[in-house]
């Protein structure tokens, strides 16, 4: 080996090995401090790509497990609501069985029907208000897709159904006997509604004249109970003409009039009935809205083919119905043109009136034209058909209404086979509850499977990217020893060129 000074090859070799051991020591320390075998792609390029795919899959499956738990929660929420609906249906069935007993009086049947109506209303409330995170679960038919996997198409569907008295076929459930309207009814501007059994009797013209005073001529009277509960009497003709506040004495069966309080009802109309008359408790009050511009709606009526429509004979009225229990039910707005009423909507805030001119004909085809209040095909008119319940006239397949200015109920029918209908409703609820129970079991199974998959994928990823501490500690110890030895050897290698100096002495 040549003796040279400029190049110390032994020192260079030692430095190179020292650098390698230092790099190995740095890698071992990094892996021990991070716990990962792969801290960057240079550590294991292929392993890093594989581990990253494992990570994406694991994260997706973990979220899918949470999704499945949400699916269980929404199914449990829906099933809980259905349980309450079932409880109400069970009570309705119990009441229907009770109503079938021949010992019930009409008053008993009325009470039973009233509770049935309340129970059905509660079913509708539960159906319309039960929600999960803003999603109404029983208000309409709906399919909720729950993602239970890390890839597209890995889903479980929850089929939700609208559950209400209508979809259960019980919205027209009636356990009362059929009835026929009385001969006499209250008439308000030719809009007639016949119903009810309780009556009151207005006194004769003579009694009314005596109460008002001898100055009245052509006296006629009818007591109309408006929404504020006040009775009024309309007196026509003579110096005493006007509308008076009145009270009705249930004991004496007489109408008493306050002669000091003659109230001009510019916004109300009462129908005159001559002589002694029987008036049902199912009365209609017509209230005219003041200050409403009817020019536009009159033009709409004319455009719809209604002759004689102008702003002077067109007004907005609001019809109210009072059932035999004294409950006032708002019948909605209508446009009065002459003796006819047309369905309309009224914006209280904007003081705007709009005629309802769309209706469905007998073939179910949407048509355009003025919709008369009481029309059998119209979708906008509202009437009260049975006590405590409001329907669209077009929905009443067991009621017959005359179109035009008069609205008259001819008859109502007792529901045939009510227990059979209730049993069918219970079966419908049970079917949906069974489906929800089954889908909860599917979610539980999916969650268990997802947990097993996540565990196995995590183990596989760990073998690829996690540090083996036994190996890395061994590598670190080896690198440290090599560092110490290399440093010592490098010092000796750097002394080799000094041997050449001995040749120069």
UniProtKB/Swiss-Prot annotation:
A Pfam entry, by short name: Flagellin_D3
Gene Ontology cellular-component terms listed: bacterial-type flagellum; extracellular region
GO molecular function per UniProt: structural molecule activity
Keywords of the record: Bacterial flagellum, Secreted
Source organism, top-level taxon: Bacteria
Gene3D superfamilies xref list: 6.10.280.190, f41 fragment of flagellin, C-terminal domain (2.30.220.10), f41 fragment of flagellin, middle domain (2.170.280.10), f41 fragment of flagellin, N-terminal domain (1.20.1330.10), Flagellar export chaperone, C-terminal domain (6.10.10.10)
InterPro entries per record: Flagellin (IPR001492), Flagellin_C (IPR046358), Flagellin_C_sub2 (IPR042187), Flagellin_D3 (IPR014981), Flagellin_N (IPR001029), FLIC_barrel (IPR049365)
Keyword Transmembrane helix among UniProt keywords: no
Localization, UniProt: Secreted; Bacterial flagellum
Note, other: Individual Salmonella serotypes usually alternate between the production of 2 antigenic forms of flagella, termed phase 1 and phase 2, each specified by separate structural genes.
Function, in words: Flagellin is the subunit protein which polymerizes to form the filaments of bacterial flagella.
UniProt similarity note: Belongs to the bacterial flagellin family.
Protein name listed in UniProt: Flagellin
Natural source organism: Salmonella muenchen
């Amino acid at each position: 080996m040549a003796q040279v000074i400029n190049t110390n090859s032994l020192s260079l070799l030692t430095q190179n090995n020292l650098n390698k051991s230092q790099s190995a020591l740095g890698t071992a320390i990094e892996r021990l401090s991070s716990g990962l075998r792969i801290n960057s792609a240079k550590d294991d390029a292929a392993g890093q790509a594989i581990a990253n795919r494992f990570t994406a899959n694991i994260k997706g499956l973990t979220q899918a497990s949470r999704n499945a738990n949400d699916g269980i929660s929404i199914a449990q929420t829906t099933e809980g609501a259905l349980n309450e609906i079932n409880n109400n249906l069970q009570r309705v069935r119990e009441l229907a069985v009770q109503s079938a007993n021949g010992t019930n009086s009409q008053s008993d049947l009325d009470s039973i029907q009233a509770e049935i109506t309340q129970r059905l209303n509660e079913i509708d409330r539960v159906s319309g208000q039960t929600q999960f995170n803003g999603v109404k679960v029983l208000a309409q038919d709906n399919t909720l897709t729950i993602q239970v996997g890390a890839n597209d198409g890995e889903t479980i569907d929850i089929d939700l159904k609208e559950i209400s008295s209508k979809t259960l076929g019980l919205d027209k459930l009636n356990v009362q006997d059929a009835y026929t309207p009385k001969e006499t009814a209250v008439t308000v501007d030719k809009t007639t509604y016949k119903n009810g059994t309780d009556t009151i009797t207005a006194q004769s013209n003579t009694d009314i004249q005596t109460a008002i005073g001898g100055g009245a001529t052509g006296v006629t009277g009818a007591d109309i109970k408006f929404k504020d509960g006040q009775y009024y009497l309309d007196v026509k003709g003579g110096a005493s003409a006007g509308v008076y506040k009145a009270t009705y004495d249930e004991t004496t069966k007489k109408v008493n009039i306050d002669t000091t309080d003659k109230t001009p009802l510019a916004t109300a109309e009462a129908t005159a009935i001559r002589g002694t008359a029987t008036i049902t408790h199912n009365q209609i009050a017509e209230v005219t809205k003041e200050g409403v511009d009817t020019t536009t709606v009159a033009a709409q009526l004319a455009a719809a083919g209604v002759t004689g429509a102008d702003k002077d004979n067109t007004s907005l009225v609001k019809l109210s119905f009072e059932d035999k229990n004294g409950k006032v039910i708002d019948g909605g707005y209508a446009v009065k043109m002459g003796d006819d009423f047309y369905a309309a909507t009224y914006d209280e805030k904007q003081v705007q009136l709009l005629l309802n001119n769309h209706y469905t004909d007998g073939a179910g085809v949407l048509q355009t034209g003025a919709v008369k209040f009481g029309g059998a095909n119209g979708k906008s008119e509202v009437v009260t058909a049975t006590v405590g319940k409001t329907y669209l006239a077009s929905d009443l397949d067991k009621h017959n209404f005359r179109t035009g200015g008069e609205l008259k109920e001819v008859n109502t029918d007792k529901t045939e086979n009510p227990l059979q209908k209730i049993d069918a409703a219970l079966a419908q609820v049970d079917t949906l509850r069974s489906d929800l129970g089954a889908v909860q079991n599917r979610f539980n199974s999916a969650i268990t499977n997802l947990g097993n998959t996540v565990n196995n994928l995590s183990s596989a990823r760990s073998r690829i990217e996690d540090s083996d501490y036994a190996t890395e500690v061994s590598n670190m110890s080896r690198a440290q020893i090599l560092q110490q030895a290399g440093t010592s050897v490098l010092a000796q290698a750097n002394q080799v060129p000094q041997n050449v100096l001995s040749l120069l002495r």
